[in-house]
Curated annotation (Swiss-Prot):
It catalyses: Preferential cleavage: (Ac)2-L-Lys-D-Ala-|-D-Ala. Also transpeptidation of peptidyl-alanyl moieties that are N-acyl substituents of D-alanine. Disulfide bonds: none annotated. It comes from the Bacteria. InterPro entries: Beta-lactam-related, Beta-lactam/transpept-like, Diverse_Enzym_Activities, Pept_S12_YfeW/YbbE-like. It is found in: Cell inner membrane. One of its GO terms (molecular function) is serine-type D-Ala-D-Ala carboxypeptidase activity. One of its GO terms (cellular component) is plasma membrane. It is an enzyme of class 3 (hydrolase). Keywords: Carboxypeptidase, Cell inner membrane, Cell membrane, Hydrolase, Membrane, Protease, Transmembrane, Transmembrane helix. The chain crosses the membrane at residues 7-25. HAMAP family: S12_YfeW. This is Putative D-alanyl-D-alanine carboxypeptidase.
Length: 432
């Protein structure tokens, strides 16, 4: 009996020695963690001036040393119905959910891949064809190399794919046209390479669409179900989902985006194009029409609190509280600078040179990493200063500046707030 008791105690001690309890976020005043509150407060007035000038909304959260030191919302989650300004616009709150756009790539797809790599279920040097049957060079391809493409090539954006084949727009996509997920994978397989893999770097949504399909192949689950049940739910995240309107959320909880669907104020047309103000549906055309709202490159919605937890997971080296998703070696592997482009890790944007100043500013450490999203979102994670910043916005919720000249430039995109680095620098400049 004594031996059994001693053995039990030793086993319990042994197991507890290997148990990891990661830091969790708490709130603190800016002064408690090294900020000058008066300097930081100046940002408040500047952002409000941007809202007054026409920027729809900004949600900002700042983490320092495991503490949330600033969380605030400015502006309106919805101020337009079509071209009409609402008499009673809906104010943004700190609980407002936003379309993350390409931050989906990091906080859905990369998080899933980092978890699967840590668990030994995938290796970044594996061939893409291992997980996607039929992914190979076609007889008529002018540029070949799909047969030898590895997952790491996709993550580094050196795989040869074009930036945006516009699959849902038949006028542009031609034979690659697809408005259903079942055919989209086949169209991706048929998409010609634009350059010899490894010869240059082109940031491509196609890369992350492929990665989404790979995750689904490994897990035998839809991408949204996998990340929502194995990552977000264990972390206690309640506002991070794909297709929020199908999962119990209502439009007033979500920031609206483009005023006239995907038409850029009436200059773009293709079959089934949305024309009403987008509110609770992913803005990205490939994600919505070609992938049913769930894709590896876009489609995720979240709020600043949930994003803060996900950024803290990265700062913690892979976990939060008693939840471990991956380890610090995996974090280092994915955030290490690419040999092809110092501003990329494995998917993550890295503060590798001065070209990243508009994103990370001039004061963040060179080890800072994160991502941006076309709808007006930024995440910045600085392991040197143990600091993270998330900016969520709905930049396309304003008129197009000049639809016939450039349909992708919105009036709000011409304002200084559209350059995240300035906001980031004001935050760093407030450190004592």
């Amino acid at each position: 009996m004594k031996f059994t008791l001693v053995a039990t105690v030793l086993l319990t001690f042994s197991l507890s020695a290997f148990a990891v309890e990661y830091p969790v976020l708490t709130t603190a005043s800016p002064d408690q963690v090294g900020f000058d509150s008066q300097k930081l407060h100046r940002l408040d007035g500047w952002i409000q001036n941007q809202i007054d000038a026409g920027y729809p909304s900004i949600n900002l959260l700042v983490i320092k040393d495991n503490h949330i030191v600033l969380q605030k919302a400015w502006g309106y989650a919805k101020k337009y119905d079509g071209s009409t300004l609402l008499a009673h616009p809906i104010r943004a709150t700190t609980n407002t959910m936003y379309d993350l756009a390409s931050n989906t790539k990091m906080y859905a797809t990369n998080f899933a891949l980092q978890k699967l790599v840590y668990e030994g279920k995938i290796d970044v040097n594996d061939l893409v064809s291992k997980y996607i049957p039929g992914f190979k060079d076609m007889p008529g391809d002018k540029i070949k190399g799909k047969d030898k493409l590895r997952i790491i090539d996709i993550l580094h954006h050196v795989a040869g794919f074009p930036a945006d084949p516009q699959y849902p727009n038949k006028n542009v996509a031609g034979k690659l046209f697809s408005q259903s997920k079942s055919t989209t994978l086949e169209m991706i397989k048929k998409t010609p390479l634009e350059y010899q893999p490894g010869s240059k770097h082109i940031y491509s949504d196609v890369d992350y669409m492929i990665l989404g399909f790979i995750i689904e192949s490994i897990t035998a689950m839809p991408l949204d179900r996998y990340v929502e049940t194995t990552i977000y739910k264990p972390l206690g995240l309640k506002h991070t989902v794909f297709n929020p309107l199908m999962k119990g959320f209502t439009p007033p909880q979500i920031a609206a985006t483009e005023l006239h669907g995907n038409t850029r104020d009436g200059v773009i047309h293709f079959p089934n194009i949305r024309t009403n103000t987008l509110w609770g549906q992913v803005h990205d055309e490939k994600a919505w029409y070609s992938m049913g709202g769930v894709s590896g490159h876009a489609g995720l919605f979240s709020d600043t609190h949930d994003m803060a937890v996900l950024m803290q997971v990265m700062l913690n080296g892979g976990g939060y509280g008693n939840v471990k998703l991956f380890d610090d070696k995996t974090v280092a592997q994915f955030t290490r600078r690419s040999p092809e482009d110092a501003t990329f890790g494995l998917g993550w944007r890295v503060n590798g040179n001065a070209s990243m100043t508009p994103t990370f500013g001039v004061l963040a450490s060179p080890q800072t990493y994160g991502h941006t999203g076309w709808t007006g979102t930024l995440t910045s994670i600085d392991p040197v200063n143990h600091m993270a910043i998330v900016i969520l916005g709905n930049r396309p919720h304003s008129p197009v500046a000049n639809p016939k000249v450039n349909p992708n430039v919105f009036v709000s995109g011409l304002l200084p707030a559209a350059t995240y680095g300035w906001i980031v620098d004001q935050i760093y400049g407030s450190l004592k």
